[in-house]
Amino acid sequence: MKAFKTRIYPNAEQTVLIEKTFGCCRFVYNNGLECKIDAYKKDKTNLSAYDLIKRITTLKKEFEWLKEVELHTLQQSILDLEKAYKNFFREHKGFPKFKKKGDKDSFRTFNMRFVSRHFIYLPKIGAVKIAEKIKKKWSIHNATISKRAGKYFISLLIDYESPKVQKTGEVVGIDLGIKTFATLSDGTKYENPKTLSKYEDKIARYQRQLSRTQKGSNNRKKVKEKLARLHLKVSNIRQDYLHKMSREIANRYSFVAIEDLNIAGMVKNHNLAKSISDCSWGEFVRMLEYKCSWYGCELRKIGRFEPSSKLCSNCGYKMNEIPLNIRKWTCPNCGTHHDRDVNAAINILNIAQEK
């Protein structure tokens, strides 16, 4: 399956209905979270998703406006809450929080259909114009409507048959870095676009303007929208670069080796946190994983504690320490001259192939 995301253009009436759906889903989610917390405090009872879904009928009688939203969409809010609880207990993620208006507004629907190549029908909302042409042969599992920086988007989960790509049998190791985003074992280098740093001054200017506005004022709302649009622009530029790079690698190679980095631990270094976050290594690896599966490429990760930078890829000699500012070095054992990043990428490939 594949997710296809594009912008939609609801009319004024549809915009109101979408905003109502956001609000109703948020209400049901928060009500379910409150019920689960209260039940556990009272007698250690853990209300199931089934228990909370049954309560939706009662809520509809008490709050008539909930009837304006499709039942399946409201039920999905409860399933999202259940997933958040499971993530908390099983994967040690943060405890579920109450949702606020404007905080990643979204909802999921299932009973949609294509009206034409430019319109998609959404239950209780109608036929909404879509930015990109749709292939009618697509089999859609669900659709997620979201809002960001005042713009509306739809993400369709569709059945996807991976294209058959003629592979050459090439193998490659990848070393991720800050100055150079990715260095491949064959010497190919992808520079870090440093997307955030290019817009940092403008972001800071908007943030200063925001701090000087009064809460609840129209000026504050306008500045917040400008800031949100700028953050969206930065995100889109970064995503586009990562998509192109990951697709190129997955398309070209038959075997890819990469280091399993502890990104959460690395961002604790306050000197490098902003640069690491701007790189979005985790997002790149995520993209590479699913694209490798599409294009018939094997992806293998090596342990984060492997000494990939300290080993001579020619003779295996291990250096005691190589400071970060040293970008090129010569092996004292065999005399091979190394580019630090290329050498690390070769070692990552060698270690992965030995497994």
Where are the model-predicted features located?
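Positively charged, helix-rich recognition surfaces that bind polyanionic ligands
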Residues: A3-K5, K136, K147-K355
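Short, glycine- and charge-enriched coil/turn segments that flank and shape catalytic ligand pockets
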Residues: A39-K54, E91, K164-T168, R212-R220
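An alpha-helix initiation/capping motif
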Residues: N46, Y50, H72-Q75, L79, ...
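Acidic carboxylate diad motif detector
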Residues: Y50-R148
